[in-house]
């Protein structure tokens, strides 16, 4: 399984969701679409680009959280267990220990570095993944093809990832 899960295309329903999102009035004035390189996000971004006419660029570091930095997990159950461990540890390795998953600190640093590159621009749409986007704005869940507005500032404090 490993990283192969990131290579699956959108389902027919996913294509319909992307097309519906592309017609949302909030995207009518976008100037640039910045996408994750992972297949479903990139396919969503391409659909939005085609419908809105906005140019599309890919940012390699805008990808989803990495549940296994070795890319060797082999089952869905193993991926779920890694995610549960991440949540149990609140995204950080216990003192003196390491885990296979990417820490919240590393995820946040990676995604914010991408957002920082575009912070000076107006009308930028990021197409990425729930866990990655949750590092930029406090929110519990991000739906498929959901539009979440954010007035990003590189100096803003880190958002809350979990309810306290």
Where are the language model's segments positioned?
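Active-site-proximal alpha-helix that buttresses catalytic centers in soluble enzyme cores
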Residues: 1-56
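Glycine-rich phosphate-binding loop signature in dinucleotide/nucleotide-binding domains
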Residues: 26-29, 118-122
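A short, acidic, amphipathic alpha-helical segment used as a generic capping/interface helix at domain edges
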Residues: 107-120
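Acidic, low-complexity terminal tails and accessory targeting/binding regions
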Residues: 57-58, 64-79, 120, 134-164
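Phosphate-handling substructures
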Residues: 4, 8-9, 50-109, 161-162
């Amino acid at each position: 399984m490993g990283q192969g899960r990131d290579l699956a295309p959108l389902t027919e329903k996913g294509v319909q969701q992307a097309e519906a999102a592309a017609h949302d009035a909030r995207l009518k004035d976008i100037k640039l679409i910045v996408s994750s390189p992972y297949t479903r996000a990139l396919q969503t971004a391409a659909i939005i680009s085609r419908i809105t006419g906005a140019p599309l660029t890919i940012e390699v570091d805008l990808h989803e959280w990495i549940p296994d930095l070795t890319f060797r997990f082999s089952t869905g159950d193993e991926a779920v267990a890694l995610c549960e461990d991440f949540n149990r540890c609140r995204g950080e390795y216990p003192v003196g220990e390491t885990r296979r998953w990417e820490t919240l600190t590393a995820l946040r640093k990676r995604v914010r570095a991408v957002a920082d590159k575009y912070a000076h621009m107006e009308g930028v749409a990021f197409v990425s993944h729930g866990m990655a986007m949750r590092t930029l704005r406090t929110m519990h869940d991000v739906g498929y093809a959901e539009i979440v507005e954010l007035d990003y500032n590189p100096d803003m404090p880190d958002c809350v990832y979990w309810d306290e």
